[in-house]
Regions:
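Generic, well-ordered alpha-helical scaffold segments in large soluble proteins
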Residues: 101, 105-112, 116, 163, ...
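Catalytic or ion-translocation cores adjacent to nucleophile or general acid/base/metal-coordination motifs
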Residues: 146, 152-169, 353-522
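Acidic, glycine-enriched catalytic cores built around paired aspartates
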Residues: 245, 250-252, 257-259, 274-302, ...
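Metal-dependent catalytic core segments for phosphate chemistry
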Residues: 258-296, 356-357, 379-394, 400
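Conserved small/polar residues in nucleotide/adenosyl-binding loops
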Residues: 750-757, 767
């Protein structure tokens, strides 16, 4: 791999600066953990994934005949699903990437470090590890059962053992030596039996597998001239990295579910009066109540399905740790964590199931702007709780906190969400340090900038001097998996980018953010003005109506690309932004080609400084703070993907002209302000490869968006008729759904820039 942000580039930089030993030391401590999620922004059938793989190989081989055949096959292969996938279907779809891509890419990274940067004694099996949500993420998805969770974990174990079996089979043909051949044959046979076993035990345990391979290594080294030692070491490294778990399956559930469960549990423990009052008690009273009573499901005999399912998810975690090892399932994530009680309720659930001192990390997820602001006081409260303090001691005094970019942006706008997340990280580190807790962050980032995405390497590099990034954990969602991690080369390249950004933040780079008091005040003011502009826009009387009638939000569920409902559970069928998930919210604006969540409020906030003769303060911020430059750079991407000609007909619409013009004005203002700050003449002029990729994609999918808008207009007119023709309504809805599915999967239709091309794109250090 060549180019900026690769390991080779990192090696060259460290050598020039006489920091080679420092780099090795840093690489021994870095941990990168991409977590694959099945968020419904893309869902390719296995047949399509196979074609993509073959097509990639044909392109590399310059085999024009094969390319033409495969493109024809792709054109005739159905992308859409007649019915929604099950959570297990989603898991199977993503394990394809684990088995065929990540397994090789992560191994290649370890090989490169050992042969080019460090030596063969280099040890850091956690340098790149994997997380996995399909089959474990229950938040808003009633179709994820405990049976599916266990089935998914066994699938992960089966797939990794299958990969080991393939590698051992190749080795067996080479290791035909005395005292070695019979051992490798025994390993091969027992691995073959193991990958079809659906029980806790396997024909060969992980410890025994390692022991036998180390015996082979020693024997070959001592008696057989170290023949094929590289291949033996590579397999041992893979086993140390992936174990029998392949990827760690996370459990996630909404805090409101836990609250309901506890009310039902207490109904059985105390008298009905106490239970019915549980929701009316203060948080402190609830904490005292659940602390005062020892609870066990062995004595309570729960019958409520919600209680059984929730407690059963903990039993499933215990079962998975038994079959796949502790790393197989060791994190319980609490969505919409709003209080210390939310964390302590989950900890209590482990006690109820009889799992005392659980080998599990309880992970609060803070999402809204208010939750982010309260996160510090929440964590201080649990750090002071004696029971939770004991739990943390059993977890090496380490706490993971997850921060949600998608819902934060939906709630407070692009600039405010990103700035509040950064400030929360700083404050959470301080409070954790005060109590002797090592804090790790897990970033819930989506693909587009509006959901925390954009240039991930720039994002983490921009943290230098502000946040420690030796441990990077982030979600990889939807189309980002296939576009950035879909092939071995692109996967390795993007993983190296993450490693590089982490290393650069450990004194290997002079690009540090200078968060002086003046710059902080400027950021706070920008955030304040941006939030006001975004909030005023959200409160516009036509905001919800515009989204409901003129976007494709309501049709996301009909594409059948994900098992999870597009809305959170609600007591009403009324269109509400509170119950709307971030993915269809951002997706709706994207399909409108307006990308509001990726820029709205940014232009207004910068312009406030401009109009008040304080633009020099923003210029200073842009020059001195890489984090701010990264925000603007990613916002440029949102602006570049916008195309207001598509909806220009709404400019004079009797219902939506005002709100359309508000959006268009903010778009133009943001573009004007960003260009003025950056010194660019055009958006993304510093990223020609990325810009060309975006433009090609937009060129291909614009007809689909045009069809959508035509069908939406037609549908709105039909519904105004006294007796609308049902068949015409059905045709329009089908047009919208089909075109939506095509545009969601559009990244299949163009070749993304290669790692080499992307490495030439740079972010300016200042205007």
């Amino acid at each position: 791999m060549d180019g900026i942000g690769t390991l080779r580039n990192l090696k060259e930089i460290s050598e020039k600066s006489n920091l080679s030993k420092e780099l090795i030391k840093i690489l021994r401590n870095i941990k990168i953990k991409p977590v694959l999620t099945a968020h419904p922004t893309q869902f390719y059938p296995g047949s399509v994934l196979g074609i993509i793989t073959d097509l990639s190989k044909a392109i590399n081989d310059n085999n024009l005949i094969e390319i033409k055949k495969l493109l024809s096959q792709l054109g005739k292969t159905p992308f859409f699903k007649k019915k929604k996938p099950s959570p297990f279907d989603e898991a199977v779809s993503l394990t394809w990437y684990l088995e065929n891509v990540f397994y090789n890419s992560i191994s290649n990274i370890q090989k490169y470090i050992k042969s080019n940067i460090a030596d063969f004694d280099f040890k850091n099996s956690d340098l790149v590890s994997l997380g996995f949500w399909p089959g474990g993420d229950r938040d808003g998805n009633p179709y994820v059962t405990n049976e599916i969770t266990i089935k998914t974990a066994l699938k992960l174990r089966s797939d990794i053992i299958k990969n080991y079996y393939r590698d051992v089979s190749k080795l067996r043909r080479r290791l035909t030596f005395k005292n070695v051949e019979e051992v490798i044959i025994d390993i091969e046979n027992r691995l073959y039996k193991s990958f079809n076993q659906n029980t806790d035990q396997t024909s060969i345990s992980l410890d025994e597998l390692k022991e036998k391979l180390n015996f082979i290594k020693e024997e070959v080294s001592q008696n057989h001239e170290s023949l094929y030692m590289d291949e033996i070491n590579e397999l041992i490294d893979k086993i140390n990295i992936f174990g029998y778990h392949f990827a760690s399956l996370d459990i996630r559930q909404d805090s409101s579910i836990h609250n309901d469960v506890f009310e039902k549990i207490l109904l059985q423990v105390f008298d009905k009066k106490t239970s019915h009052n549980y929701k009316t008690l203060s948080d402190d009273e609830k904490i005292l109540l659940i602390k005062s009573k020892k609870l066990s499901n062995n004595t309570l005999n729960f019958t409520d399905s919600q209680v059984l399912s929730t407690l059963g998810s903990i039993d499933a975690m215990r079962s998975i740790q038994k079959s796949n090892g502790e790393k197989g399932c060791h994190r319980y994530i609490i969505s919409h964590n709003q209080s210390a009680l939310n964390i302590l309720e989950v900890h209590k659930m482990f006690e109820i199931t009889g799992w005392i001192n659980p080998s599990v990390d309880i992970v609060p997820l803070f999402e809204t702007i208010q939750d982010l602001k309260h996160s510090v006081s929440i964590m201080e409260k649990v750090y002071n709780n004696s029971i939770y303090k004991n739990h943390l001691e059993n977890r090496n005094n380490e706490q993971i906190v997850m921060l949600g970019f998608s819902d934060g942006t939906k709630d407070g706008g692009y600039l405010t969400a990103n700035w509040n997340i950064l400030k929360s990280k700083e404050q959470l580190i301080d409070i954790s340090s005060k109590y002797g807790i090592k804090l790790k962050f897990f970033d819930g980032r989506g693909g587009p900038p509006a959901r925390g995405g954009g240039n991930t390497h720039q994002f983490y590099s921009s943290m230098a001097g502000i946040i420690d990034t030796t441990d990077i954990q982030l979600t990889i969602q939807g189309q980002t998996i296939s576009s950035n991690f879909g092939t071995i080369d692109s996967c390795q390249y993007n993983l190296e980018q993450l490693i590089s950004s982490a290393c650069n933040n450990q004194n290997l780079s002079d690009s540090f953010s200078h968060l002086s008091d003046d710059n902080r005040k400027t950021m706070d003011r920008l955030s304040e003005y941006s939030f006001k502009a975004y909030n005023d826009f959200k409160n516009h009387p036509m905001f919800l109506s515009y989204l409901e009638k003129m976007s494709t939000i309501k049709y996301y569920a009909k594409t059948n690309i994900g098992s999870r409902p597009s809305k959170r559970k609600s007591s009403s069928d009324v269109f509400e932004i509170e119950t709307l998930r971030a993915i269809p919210f951002v997706g709706g604006w994207s399909q409108l080609k307006q990308n509001v969540p990726g820029f709205f409020g940014l232009g207004s906030s910068i312009n406030f400084f401009h109009e008040n003769n304080e633009f020099n303060k923003v210029e200073k911020l842009y020059k001195e703070m890489p984090f701010f430059r990264t925000l603007l750079s990613n916002s440029m991407m949102s602006l570049q993907k916008s195309f207001f000609d598509l909806t220009h007909y709404l400019k004079d619409d009797k219902d939506f002209s005002e709100i359309w013009n508000i959006i268009y004005s903010e778009y133009n203002l943001t573009k004007q302000m960003i260009l003025k700050l950056s010194g660019f003449k055009k958006l993304m002029e510093n990223e020609p490869a990325n810009k060309a990729s975006i433009n090609k994609r937009e060129e291909i999918i614009l007809p689909l968006f045009t069809i959508q808008q035509f069908a939406l207009q037609k549908l709105n007119k039909l519904r105004l008729e006294e007796n609308p023709a049902k068949n015409k309504i059905k045709v329009c809805e089908k047009l919208i759904t089909r075109s939506l599915f095509g545009s969601i999967n559009a990244c299949l239709l163009y070749t993304s820039p290669s790692p080499r091309d992307l490495s030439t794109s740079r972010m300016p250090s200042s205007a």
